Structure formats: structure tokens, C-alpha cells
């Protein structure tokens, strides 16, 4: 099989700018069923991660132009989770976690907001502004209600960081090098303490980038001089000071019981401070470097079964670090490439497409190279949520959270002519997923609240396209927007697949529900539920009505759509996955079948590509040996027996030889944006090496420490 290995795509994700866990830590507490991590990026998008199943991305809340996320807080209630964000504007945004849209935008009635904090006990939201105002809002009215409460005693400097010490004391770190404490119990919310930090370099006032309050009342600050200071929370006096950072300390993390503090910043060091055995004094135990550029934010969560420190910054990757074994256990870096692919392939036309923020780019796979064809730039403020291209490349659909646009393409030897298909329905509905049928006569649209629409495209010249709203499952399992239960939030449709014969399409959600629709009579059938998040699925081209599914638990299932049961292959093999596959940390990003071997179910992720032959039985489980990866591994040409021999020496594992190979996996290609079939016996592999991302023009230089003699 020939592989087109592509590395020229200039795709660089946005920096991570803010993050927060949905629940407060408790070392002796059980893990909440609905524990989530919100990660904000400079593009304005917010990613919602599930710590279960080795950190799966549940959904993305899409932002827009000049809406960088600079602060995130959660309000945790018995009936709902509420998510609030700020972004260098005068607006506080509350997000609808069911639809992914902003629920309400509340103006601060002050300057641009730089910091945000929340007190769940009193349902009070506090924001700090660049004009020195600190504004309180009441959120006790429920989702969508943010009511102005009052403005605290004014001061003149920008408020860079906020945290509630108690329900009556609010701590703010300011741009004049002073930590201020407001007493909210007094009528005028007076400032009861001012704590001055040391001046930064060149005599300038230090910028206090982060403040945190511990359970015993201790206040911790991090500032632009690189200092981390511990303050007595009762008398508001300095207890201890550490100046271990070589540049600005930007963020702080605190353990559940307040016995550990972590700091990081521009110098990339993550430093651990601890107070052990009931001692009053803090000590700096150790430091490690996990990131290659500035660390902008961190969050800590601890419970009985989980203790993690998550950090992120300019290098776009999430670091997952053990809290209690900080300097003893290995950390994990979650790849910067998007877990929901931002690329698609049109196999008949040998085209592939990339979308990002507000633009879509299109290339043709030629012989011997690639040819850039088209760039579509949207005038909308909202970021692109999804896009799709028809198999013959003549139609492209692009969607945001508010609207969908359809384009018709005509190709000539030198140019591509683009015409916009105007339609009032598409102009007023956003989509989370889009897919064309094989004959391009229908567009399947999944709305932000998991409604499914079928748009008839056979008569594009008509004034109004024919639209069918498909019936929803009666159990409402796949339409969680109707329910108020916390556990249903973000559990919308996450995957879609269309059969190559045009008879069926299937949708699946993040809790394992799978529904298959008939394109002829638009009825649906419910398939057996899998036990975890459906990551990718595809229909077999050689057997009618067979759907293969890859889950977040690293399991592969095959369903017979007509009987609504597992196939014989799945009954025999789904619980017998090879260790090389079942123990993978990176979950599947996509799946497909190739035309030369139509029974081979290809699955790929950021750092691996594999296939299962669904006509062959897997052998009995065997222990997974240590995988050795050589950079000169040669599997980018023909996948023949000679190149697949000696599996462990080149990062490849396979069961069987030739056409009798029932399983194969390689770790050579990394990290990947797309893997897809582009013709008979041809694969397209699009890589975006991390080194190329970090050297892109948009990436600032990392901190450099000049040493004597260097």
C-alpha cells in the first residue's frame, strides 16, 4: 500500500490561556461522576475534558474573533454546572453546556476584565478590571442569570488576579505591586489590608499575576519579579518569600488540603512547595520542566482515586502531572493536535481540506507532489465548528455555532470557481457535525443541541433547499438538552458515519449510545450501547449494514445494523483486543475502511495508526513487550512483509503476515492531523511535528537564561 506522507501543512493550535476544574478537591472524597476540566485557548475556544478514560475531549465551545479566554470559573450546584469566562473585554460570558453557545453576556459596567473569581457559598461572582474596579455579581438566580450586586471600594491600579479567602474576604493582586483585601461584610466593602511586594527589575512595581488562598487562610502570591510569597491570612503579614523563578511567575496551583503549592511561569519551571508534618514553614522541594515555552495556567484536583496537576501555556500542550509523586513519577503530555480532526479527505477527487478558526484550505494530491487549490476566508466573527467535503470534491459545507454555509466548486486546469449556495435554513442554523452522502445529493447536519437534519441537495438551483428534521429517539438518550441532570451536560452527538452504498448513516454520543438511520425511509434503529465514549466509526464497504466502532476504552465493536446485534467477529474478538492496542493512552481520532482491503478497519490517533481485519480472528492475548521506536523506520512506502518484519525493531506490531494479518499498528508517524484513504491501495498521512509548531512565525521565543561563558 502506497502512503502519501504530508508534512507541509502550516497548522498551529492556539496557546492555552486558562483552565479550571468543575469541582473542588477533597482528598477523602470520591471522584464526582461529572468531573470536567475546562481549558481556554487564545482563539476563544474552550475545550471540555473528561478525566475519566485517560483524558478524553468531550466537546468544544467555540469562540470568535478577539475573544481570547483569559479566565475560567465553574459554579457547582446540585442540579447544574455553570461555566463562566472572561477575555480582555468588558463582558462576562456564561456558556450553555448543552448547546455550546453563550447563554448570556453580561457587561461589567467598568473597564476591561482581567481577573475573575467565584464563591459558591454565597453564589457571588467577582471580576477585576483594568480601571481598578472590582465588581460583584449575584448568580443565585440560576443559569442565565447574572445580576449586578455592587462595586467594591475603588483603587486605581489594574486588578490582575482575584481569589476568595472566605465568603467575606476577597483578595486581589494588582499592577501596582500591592495585594489588597476587601471586606465584603461591611457596607462600603472597605479595603482592610494592603500588602506590598518587592519591586521588580529596574525599580518598576511588580505585577501580581496570581493569588491563591489556602484552607488555613494563608495567602500565596506570584509576581513579575519571579517571587512566590506566603502571607499570614489573619494579620496580613509576610511569612515567607521564595525567589526561585528567573522571570515572571504567572500561575499557582494548590493541593486539596493546602499542604502543597505549585508555581510556574515564563522560565518554564514548575516548582513544588510543601509544608509537611504540621510544620509552619514552607520549603521548596524540587522543580521540573514540562513545557518548552511560557506556562500560563495550572489547575489541581485531588480525590481518592485521582491526584493531578494540569498545566498549559504557549506550547499548546497539556501536561498531566501527579501531585503526591511530583518528582517520582512520570508525567504525560497530551498532544497539541486537535482530538477532533480539523481535516477531511475527498477520496474520489484526491483532495484534502483543512479548516481552522475562520479559513478553509484545499489541496489536491498529485503525482508526484501536492497542489494548493483554494482558500476560503469567512467574514463571520464566530470560529468554524466543523466542515465537510463531498467525495467528488464539488461541494463544501462550513459551519459555526450560528450558521452553515454551502459552496459549490467547479474545477478547471488552472483555477477553481466557487459559488455560494444561498439558503435561509442553513443561514440560521449552526452545526457540530456535517457529512455528505456518497452521491453528494444529501447533507447530514447535526445541530449544536443534537438535532439531526437531512438537506436534499439534488436541486441546488432551487430557491429553497428541501430540509427534513429526523425523528429523535423516544428515550431522548441522544438529546441531552432536554434534561437538567448534571451528568447529561456535554453529552451530545460526537461522531457520524455514512455508508458507502448510501443506505445508512449512524450517529453516536459521548455516553455510548449509537443510532442508525435509514436514508431511504428516514427511520432509525438503536444499536446496543457501548460502555464508554464513541471515538470513531465507519461502515464496511464489502458487507451491507455493518458498522465498526472504536471507543475511548480502546475497544473495537462491529454491529449488524439489520439485526441490531453484534456481529460474530465482535462477539469473538471485542473482549480480546491486543495489548498493543488496549493499553494505548492516546485515544482514536478517526476511522475508515480502505478499498483494496475492504475488511480492514483502520483506526488512527495522534501518535499511532492501526488496522483490524474484520474477516480474521484475533489470536489469544499476548503480553505487550516494550516498544522500541527508531526514527529511520521505513513504512512510508509499500506495506509489504519485508518492511513489516521484525516488528519491535521499528515501532510496528502485527499479528500474521500478508493478507492474513488480522492486526497491525505502527507508532512511526507523529503527531498526525489526518489519516485517510485516497484511492485504491493509497493512504494519506498528514503530520504536523511539534518542532514545526514551536518554530512557527506566530510562536514567540522561549525564555533564555544567559550563563557565564555562553
From Swiss-Prot:
GO terms for biological process: maturation of SSU-rRNA from tricistronic rRNA transcript (SSU-rRNA, 5.8S rRNA, LSU-rRNA). The gene is utp4. Component of the ribosomal small subunit (SSU) processome. Its main location: nucleus. WD repeats lie at residues 11-59, 64-105, 108-147, 154-192, 199-241, 290-327, 328-365, 488-527, 529-569. Involved in nucleolar processing of pre-18S ribosomal RNA. Required for optimal pre-ribosomal RNA transcription by RNA polymerase I together with a subset of U3 proteins required for transcription (t-UTPs). PROSITE patterns: WD_REPEATS_1, WD_REPEATS_2, WD_REPEATS_REGION. GO terms for molecular function: snoRNA binding. It comes from the Eukaryota. InterPro entries: Quino_amine_DH_bsu, UTP4, WD40/YVTN_repeat-like_dom_sf, WD40_repeat_CS, WD40_repeat_dom_sf, WD40_rpt. This is U3 small nucleolar RNA-associated protein 4.
